[in-house]
């Protein structure tokens, strides 16, 4: 395979490459090799990690080239590290038989970790409505928590408006769209699955 074709193929793996901001930050931080057994998924991680064709391609890429972009994780109080960015890379590496992974370890608050986790995963090409719904809700709650701590005198309605807009920022959507997605989290699982299945028809 021509070298250019390999590069083009690798560039399509959104779970291997992170955002430009994250890459710049990684250059300023030390990458550590962490045993896979010490890495744990993010609590209530809203994005599915599926053993589909895309994962199979990622596993083959990891076997050939390794994990090209480090994971981001934070220390857990009980030991080990909680993955913030890189759940698919971790799963692919496990299937590929790797024993350690390159990881950037950061000390982060719960809210800051939620925001980074959501933002890094929203770079993926195909995201189910249910994933967006719970991700937006988690980010909205985290932003509200941060706002409540920094400005306890702000009116609740105004704070909600700003928070919705903050979640929408960078996604090319409006605060109203964010609210519509978040309302999906109130659906029973059967109805939420129907919404996801309908979206897959149009992918």
Where are these regions (language model features)?
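Conserved small/polar residues in nucleotide/adenosyl-binding loops
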Residues: 201-203
């Amino acid at each position: 395979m021509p070298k250019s074709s390999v590069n083009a193929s690798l560039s399509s793996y959104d779970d291997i490459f992170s955002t430009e901001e994250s890459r710049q930050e990684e250059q300023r931080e030390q990458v550590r090799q962490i045993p896979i057994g010490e890495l744990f998924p993010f609590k209530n991680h809203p994005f599915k990690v599926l053993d589909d064709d895309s994962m199979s391609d990622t596993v083959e890429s990891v076997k050939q080239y390794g994990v090209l972009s480090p994971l981001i994780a934070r220390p857990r109080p009980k030991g080990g590290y909680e993955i913030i960015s890189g759940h698919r890379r971790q799963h692919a590496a496990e299937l590929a038989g790797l024993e350690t992974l390159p990881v950037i370890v950061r000390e982060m608050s719960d809210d800051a970790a939620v925001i980074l986790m959501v933002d890094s995963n929203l770079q993926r090409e195909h995201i189910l409505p249910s994933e967006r719904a719970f991700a937006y809700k988690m980010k909205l709650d985290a932003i509200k928590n941060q706002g409540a701590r920094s400005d306890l005198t702000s009116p609740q309605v105004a704070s909600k408006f700003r928070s919705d807009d903050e979640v929408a920022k960078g996604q090319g959507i409006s605060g109203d769209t964010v609210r519509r997605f978040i309302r999906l989290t109130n659906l029973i699982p059967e109805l939420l699955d129907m919404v996801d299945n309908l979206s897959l028809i149009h992918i």
